[in-house]
Amino acid sequence: MWIKELELKHYRNYDHLLASFSSGLNVFIGNNAQGKTNFLEAIYFLSLTRSHRTRADKELIHFDHSTVSLTGKIQRISGTVDLEINLSDKGRVTKINALKQAKLSDYIGTMMVVLFAPEDLQLVKGAPSLRRKFIDIDLGQIKPVYLSELSHYNHVLKQRNSYLKSAQQIDAAFLAVLDEQLASYGARVMEHRIDFINALEKEANTHHQAISNGLESLSLSYQSSVVFDKKTNIYQQFLYQLEKNHQKDFFRKNTSVGPHRDELAFYINGMNANFASQGQHRSLILSLKMAEVSLMKALTGDNPILLLDDVMSELDNTRQTKLLETVIKENVQTFITTTSLDHLSQLPEGIRIFHVTKGTVQIDSDIH
């Protein structure tokens, strides 16, 4: 899939913008604080209905307006789709082909994106919540049912934690009802995550071995707070551990086990990647991003759109070449932001160049 056209009204520092793109590589050049990242953020927001930079929608609204409108024309294998998101103080409205969508799980996945931003380099050593978010964003685009089950899980988890914080003593019968619901939704969330990580590991290791010239292997490990011996009995084991932890959870005022506490670990040649070098970290993250692209296509039959936000300067020539070779081979529409073309090596033909200045975007040329 690829985005043919994007229109922004009152988004960040863009008062009004209408732009069309190449189905291949699109490069946005400009000094810092001109709107390059805002532009990629808008594409990300149109896809996922959320920003990767802020949780406050009001920060997305142009300073002298009260509403935001984003519309995009997306070319999928199945045909052209029009997406629209409108933001105001009354909330947000999402539409597909002018039809309002009642549930996010009906909207997300229509346009898939993979974002590679500087903060992704913290994925290995950052907080566990970053790695869970990484899984949730990809799975939510690939499997809409996952978003629904995760939403139900989080709703019951909130209810259970609220009860634990307010209760003066344990009502075992009431907790048993919540435990059953939490274990049911949570087990399905974990099953989806385990299948996804197993598939992602295969793709990521293939890319990582290519980047390292066969010197390194990459493995991923989904580490659950729920102890189980096989995937088919996650529900029973989760339910048992919830019941066993009633007293501990009551004392701590929160739920001690479940997918909300699960971890994702990375290993290079069998060694925990927390102890890897900076160069190895870059190769690992690059391998993951290329694996995301490959896996989304394998599981859905359509390519995602790749957003590279000021990361090419973080990669040496070898890693840049591997990345560009992948997107060209897979025919992935790619958006790159940079302050200068000097940061990019071995650019292929057919690139569309845009210049970004103070919230305006001007097309330069197509390189043939």
From Swiss-Prot:
One GO cellular component term noted in the UniProt record for this chain: cytoplasm
GO biological process assignments: DNA replication; DNA synthesis involved in DNA repair; double-strand break repair; SOS response
Location in the cell: Cytoplasm
ATP-binding as UniProt keyword: yes
Stored CDD domains: ABC_RecF (cd03242)
GO MF term (any one): single-stranded DNA binding
Keywords recorded for this protein, A-Z: ATP-binding, Cytoplasm, DNA damage, DNA repair, DNA replication, DNA-binding, Nucleotide-binding, SOS response
Signal peptide: none
PROSITE patterns with a match to the protein in the record: RECF_1, RECF_2
Positions bound to ATP: 30-37
Gene3D superfamilies for the chain: P-loop containing nucleotide triphosphate hydrolases (3.40.50.300), RecF/RecN/SMC, N-terminal domain (1.20.1050.90)
Keyword Cytoplasm in annotation: yes
Pfam families listed in its UniProt record: SMC_N
Function according to Swiss-Prot or TrEMBL: The RecF protein is involved in DNA metabolism; it is required for DNA replication and normal SOS inducibility. RecF binds preferentially to single-stranded, linear DNA. It also seems to bind ATP.
Family: Belongs to the RecF family.
Official protein name in the record: DNA replication and repair protein RecF
Source species of the chain: Streptococcus pyogenes serotype M12 (strain MGAS9429)
